[in-house]
């Protein structure tokens, strides 16, 4: 399959197909998506060497991962985001590079990528509330898109993000509707912007019902299974334990489930658990009936859209910044139920 044949199959000109694959802004999103899907279905890939010579581009996109958040490499969200982005890169004839970086070396890595011309653009992962990478990359003149947002960064930049505040407000409201008032929040690292926004949503839902937040029921760490287990074990031993847990990660929610079981309690009966992000390529939340009630975000789609956004910026560096907010679905599973009339305390 070559460009001429692909264009004929789609009933489009070769110029339109080429511009769609290269992310040119004058091609509509519907046409661009149609062309990319056809390219994937037929196995068509542009010749990167020829395109690189013709355009002066590296035909590669960079993903720089800070070692301080290296747990992201084991996070199924990161894996599915990369999988979605890779579909767009493949259709457009781009390669992808992954670089691990220490915090002190991160700026040098970006400068090196820029100086060597190894990549044409960057996807920024795991933005912090205040993130110096955004003004740095802007000053460097490197096209980039942020997966997430940085609340304290005022300058305009391109990003794609979940409505984390809305998702966690809805999740907490669902638990409040079930009669829960002692709702624990097991969040991500407090410096991460997504965790900040999720806590805002949680607090907003409590405030709307006149429920005062208890600092003893709010915790933020790296979202691992042991973290979920330890936090839930400690909270269940409180004099007035939580009757529900709102958890920022399915992996941590699995740890919460283990703590509930070890305490001799039943998830969904004695204690409710509501997780965020529950359906991944290699980690599934049950089959016909989800085990966990969860807010489900379109992670793979976010990867595709972020890659398309970046390719448009590479094709036309003068474009104004683009932003996109995606919504989460509330999926009802077996892990939630009405609040018990009297919470069961677990001996410490």
Predicted regions and their residues:
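Alpha-helical recognition/docking segments in bacterial nutrient-uptake
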Residues: 60-64, 68-173, 177, 235-237, ...
């Amino acid at each position: 399959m070559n460009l001429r044949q692909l264009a004929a199959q789609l009933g489009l000109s070769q110029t339109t197909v080429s511009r769609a694959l290269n992310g040119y802004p004058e091609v509509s999103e519907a046409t661009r998506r149609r062309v990319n899907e056809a390219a994937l279905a037929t196995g068509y890939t542009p010749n990167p060497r020829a395109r690189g010579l013709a355009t002066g581009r590296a035909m590669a996109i960079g993903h720089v991962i800070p070692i301080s958040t290296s747990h992201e490499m084991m996070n199924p969200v990161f894996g599915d985001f990369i999988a979605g982005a890779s579909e767009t890169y493949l259709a457009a004839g781009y390669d992808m590079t992954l670089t691990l970086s220490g915090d002190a070396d991160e700026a040098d890595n970006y400068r090196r990528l820029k100086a060597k011309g190894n990549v044409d653009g960057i996807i920024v992962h795991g933005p912090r509330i205040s993130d110096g990478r955004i003004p740095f990359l802007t000053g460097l003149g490197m096209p980039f898109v942020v997966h997430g947002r940085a609340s304290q960064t005022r300058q305009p930049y391109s990003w794609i993000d979940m409505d984390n505040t809305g998702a966690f407000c809805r999740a907490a409201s669902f638990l409040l509707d079930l009669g829960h008032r002692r709702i624990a929040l097991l969040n991500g690292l407090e410096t991460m912007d997504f965790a900040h926004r999720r806590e805002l949503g949680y607090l907003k839902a409590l405030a709307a019902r006149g429920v005062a937040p208890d600092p003893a029921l709010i915790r933020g760490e790296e979202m691992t299974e042991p973290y979920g287990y330890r936090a839930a074990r400690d909270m269940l031993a409180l004099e007035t334990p939580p009757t529900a847990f709102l958890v920022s990660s399915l992996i941590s929610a699995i740890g919460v489930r283990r703590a509930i079981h070890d305490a001799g309690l039943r998830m969904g009966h004695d204690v409710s658990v509501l997780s965020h992000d529950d359906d991944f390529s290699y980690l599934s939340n049950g089959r016909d009936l989800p085990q966990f009630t969860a807010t489900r975000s379109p992670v793979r789609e976010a990867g595709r859209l972020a890659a398309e956004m970046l390719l448009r910026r590479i094709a036309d560096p003068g474009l104004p910044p683009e932003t996109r907010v995606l919504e989460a679905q509330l999926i009802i599973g077996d892990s939630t139920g009405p609040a018990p009339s009297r919470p069961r305390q677990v001996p410490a």
